[in-house]
Every structure is written in C-alpha cells, then in structure tokens.
UniProtKB/Swiss-Prot annotation:
It catalyses: Release of an N-terminal amino acid, Xaa-|-Yaa-, in which Xaa is preferably Leu, but may be other amino acids including Pro although not Arg or Lys, and Yaa may be Pro. Amino acid amides and methyl esters are also readily hydrolyzed, but rates on arylamides are exceedingly low; Release of an N-terminal amino acid, preferentially leucine, but not glutamic or aspartic acids. The lineage of its organism: Bacteria, Pseudomonadati, Spirochaetota, Spirochaetia, Spirochaetales. Keywords: Aminopeptidase, Cytoplasm, Hydrolase, Manganese, Metal-binding, Protease. Its main location: cytoplasm. It comes from Treponema denticola (strain ATCC 35405 / DSM 14222 / CIP 103919 / JCM 8153 / KCTC 15104). Its cofactor is Mn(2+). It comes from the Bacteria. Its EC number is 3.4.11.1, 3.4.11.10. InterPro entries: Leucine_aapep/pepB (IPR011356), Macro_dom-like (IPR043472), Peptidase_M17_C (IPR000819), Peptidase_M17_leu_NH2_pept (IPR023042), Peptidase_M17_N (IPR008283). The keyword Nucleotide-binding does not apply. This is Probable cytosol aminopeptidase. Mn(2+) 1 binds at residues 247, 324, 326.
Length: 476
C-alpha cells in the first residue's frame, strides 16, 4: 500500500456520518439496507456508468475516535482489496476533537492491517492488489498528516514483523533462527544485538533458563538488544520477552490438542523484537535494552523433572512443581540479567504465560501485575492511544505466599488458584532490587487469537508493539 499526500485520483470515497443521511441516493441505500452510515459500515458498488463508488460510514460524529477510524478504514481497505481497486482518494475533514496527525495515523493503520496475510507456506498464494491511497487532509495540515501516516507505516512494519515471527512454526522459528532474524532486522535500524550461546549462558550461571532448555537438541540463545538514543538521561528501560519457541510441557506433557499452537509461546519475544524495531526505526529519544532467553521445552532422558530443585542466576533456589510452568523460569534469569548486569532502572516483561489469564480475560484483554502505580499509569495512557487493553490484577500478600516452597526459596507453581497473579509475582521476585519499577504483562490470550476481532485477523496479532512504542517514546 502506497500513500500520497494532497493528491487527487482514483475511486473517491464518500465519508458519511450516520445522522447526516437525508434524502437522495444515500437515503435509498439506507432504505434498501445496503448502507446505514454507522461506524464500520462500508458499501462498494458500480453506478449505471460502471463508475466505482465507495461509501464509508463514520457513525455519530460526536462518538468518533481513533479506534473507530482504525476499524472503519480496515473495513474500507478490505473492500477495496476484495474488488481489486488500485487507487482511492480520501478527503478527510477535521473530525470531532481529533488532530490531523492522529487521524491520519489511525486511518493509515487500519488500512494497512487489511493488507496483512500469512500465506508463505501456501503453494497457490495469489498476489494482492497494490493500493495507492491519495490522502487529502484539512487544508494547511498536510505536514501533520504526512507525519502521522509515516509513523503508521513504520509502526505497522514492526507489528507485522512480530506477527510473522509468532505465526511461523517451530521447525522454522527456533532459538538460532529467532536470534538471527532479530540481529538482521534490528541491526539494520541501529540496534546493537548480542547473541549468547550455551557456553556463555552457563558462564552467567543462568541455571533456571538452562534447565528448561536441557531436553531440546536446539541450543538455547540469550538475545540482548540495546538501543541508546537519549544520552542526557540516566533512565534505562528493559523489555524482557518470553522466548519459548516450542513448549511441549516437558514431563508434565500437554495434551496433543494443546500442543498444536505452542510455537506461539515465544509471543513475548516477538513483541519485544517488534517494539525495538519500532523505537529504532522512528528514532525515539529513549534508552532501552531488551532481553530474550530463547529455548524449547521438550522431553528427553536429560530433561528436568517435577520435584527437582534448581538454582537461578540470582542465587535463589526453585522447587519444580510443574515442568509446564517453564516460562517463568526463563524469565527469572532474564529479568535478573536485565536489572543486575545491564543496569535497567525500570522493566516490563511480556509473556504468553498462563491459561489462567485467558480464562479470566479472554483474547481481547491482556493481564498485568505491577509494583508501581505511576509506571503503570504510563502504560494505560499508551494503551488508550494504541487501542489496546491491559487490565491490572491485584498483588496482595496472599498471592506471594502461594509461591513459597517448604524445601527451596520458591516453587515454580503457586497452585490452581490465582494462577496469573502468582506467575507474575514469581517473575517479579527476580528483580535485582525489589523497588525497581516493574510491570508484568501476560499476553497468553492476546498474542495469538482464534477468532477475528475488529481489524485483527485470527492468529498472531502483534499486540502491545504499538503501546510499548507510545509509552517509551512519550508519544502517548
């Protein structure tokens, strides 16, 4: 999809507010129940002269917001693609209280979402129509609109990178290839990427991470990404992503039906890599480090077992209650490394961690636990800008006690109750200093969805790449 600013040509889209359908052809369409003007209502047709017409409903004028624009223009672009339209003209007036910059960004984002396809393994895949969008904003606001569109294009490139990583199967994306792609994609944008193999991980004494990786023939990789673009600041924010490229459950083996999509268990690492891509590509004024401890959780004669007691980089010991509660073990060492060795002053970890989160919040809302109200409020503000939802869960002492072991410092499963909170608090207990502002985000339901929602097609979503960019770049 190509965007031009202040240019005419192509099918002229007619933008219609629901309350302004009065008489004439639009009223005829409404009576025939072909077009109502409601948000997300799009109608494409040919007139008697075979001239294409495109009607885009915006709903009630006072209710329009960025998410309405994303969903509506996703529908519009989908209709254009279906009808193989190559050029469209959008004449966008000032909308409600939205600035031209954010309006253009949301419209472009929605349209770009419609272009995403995951069909690389299909032998009969077809070429998609390349659409040219001639975008005409309010007069005098061309520069602001162009900035918004350029930001959307780069953000969506990062989101699509995340979606591609998460969608690909475990025989294609495993620790070595994940590290290779991260290095290729991010170094091209100015991010320093260091990949540590098994020997370096052993030297770091990352025992929790190594125990999870033991049974796999794929060598574990510790992927460290560094982006420094704010020399005047002492703040260094860490992003830590769960990097399980396949999770069989280990000896606490999953049922066959639950294993089918476990190549997506590296969703946290995909989000982190995508966020780093966006931050660097858009030259955000921020210092960010990112850490991914990537491995597979498999079964072999050398695999770790329920009942084992293992160490960790922090020195804390862990009783293994369940080998399928492995993600928090890899995160434990990664979080400690980020805060102790890299000196992160704040940290966000993201993981497809618990089924409990999916049961509680479904596929449209991510769950979170945090130790810092102010830090979390920054995320909420970014979520609002991005159209993404993260719901904060309680962190009362009761949940912390559930992680205590009688034979070790901690156990890796707090039991059946409060599973999302106990898992998150387990991860947080490996901060090098307990007062480091920290947010744990469980994206088990949102990283990979089973049903289409709004402008997100089923499968990988790229969730929270946008929110992390807005939050860390202070663009929210």
């Amino acid at each position: 999809m190509k965007f031009n600013i202040a240019k005419k040509g192509g099918v002229v889209a007619q933008l219609v507010f629901e309350e302004k359908i009065e008489g004439g052809y639009l009223n005829h369409l409404k009576e025939k129940e072909l077009f109502s003007g409601k948000a997300e209502d799009v109608y494409y047709t040919l007139d008697s002269n075979l001239k294409a017409q495109l009607f885009i409903g915006l709903g009630k004028e006072e209710k329009i917001d960025l998410e309405v624009l994303r969903k509506t223009f996703f529908k519009a672009a989908s209709e254009l693609l279906k009808n193989k339209v190559e050029e469209v003209e959008l004449n966008i007036p000032k909308l409600n209280n939205l600035c031209n910059y954010k309006t253009a960004e949301a419209i472009a984002e929605g349209m770009l979402h419609a272009t995403y396809k995951y069909d690389k393994f299909k032998s009969d895949r077809k070429e998609q129509t390349e659409i040219t969008v001639n975008y005409n904003p309010e007069k005098g606001k061309e520069d602001r609109a162009e900035k918004g569109i350029n930001e959307a294009v780069k953000l969506m490139e990062a989101v699509f990178l995340t979606r591609d990583l998460v969608n690909q199967p475990a025989n294609v994306i495993y620790p070595e290839t994940l590290a290779k792609i991260a290095k290729e994609k991010l170094e091209a944008k100015g991010v320093k990427v260091t990949v540590h193999g098994k020997k370096e991980i052993e030297a770091l004494k990352m025992e929790a991470f190594l125990n999870v990786a033991r049974a796999s023939t794929k060598e574990p990789k510790l992927i460290v990404m560094e982006y420094y673009n704010n020399p005047g600041s002492n703040e260094k924010i860490a992003l830590v992503g769960k990097g399980l490229t396949y999770d069989s459950g280990g000896y606490a083996i999953k049922p066959a039906t639950s294993m089918v999509d476990m190549f997506t268990d590296m969703g946290g690492s995909g989000t982190v890599i995508g966020a780093m891509h966006a931050l660097a590509d858009l030259k955000a004024k921020v210092n960010v480090v990112a850490v991914v401890a990537s491995c597979e959780n498999m079964i072999s004669g050398d695999g770790y077992r329920n009942g084992d007691i293992i160490g960790s980089m922090s020195g804390k010991t862990i009783e293994i209650i369940n080998t399928d509660a492995e993600g928090r073990l890899t995160l434990a060492d990664a979080v400690y490394y980020a805060t102790n060795n890299l000196g992160a002053t704040k940290l966000i970890d993201l993981a497809t961690l618990t089924g409990a989160c999916v049961s509680a919040l479904g596929e449209q809302v991510s769950g979170a636990v945090t130790n810092n109200d102010e830090f979390f409020s920054e995320l909420v503000k970014a979520n609002e800008r991005a159209g993404e939802i993260v719901w904060r869960m309680p962190t009362i002492e009761y949940y912390k006690k559930m992680n205590e072991s009688k034979v070790a410092d901690l156990k890796n499963s707090g039991g059946k109750l409060g599973g999302m909170m106990t898992a998150g608090l387990f991860v947080g207990s490996f901060l090098a200093k307990e007062d480091i502002p920290w947010i744990h985000i469980d994206i088990a339901g949102t990283a990979y969805i089973t049903e289409k929602f709004g402008y997100l097609k089923e499968n990988a979503t790229g969730t929270l790449v946008k929110s992390l960019y807005y939050m860390l770049s202070k663009e929210a």
